Amino acid sequence: MRYPMTPDGRYFVVRGRLWRCTNPTLPPEERTQLTHELMHYRAAIGRALRAQDKAAEKEARAQVHKLKVALGERGAVWWEDGAPDYNRRLAKNTPYATWYAELPVLEED
């Protein structure tokens, strides 16, 4: 399923919440490598949780955060026009509210 993306390409929406997109200026090879590493550490979180290994979980979560910053999904925004960041905010409470309200209703999985 493709999630709706804001007209400016900065966010996608899941269950009414805005999530910052990956920086589109990243070279494809770099984006692929970072995404691969991100998936590895997300899986490591799951393994650590199942093993009840708090230290491994903490390390994996730190790596996920680091990689999401590198991808532009967290940390400083990747756009340069001075617009504020609405990451993780409900779309209805942001300047994207009108756009969001006009989206067709999608069935959630």
Where are these regions (language model features)?
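Extended, charge-rich alpha-helical interface modules
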Residues: 1-109
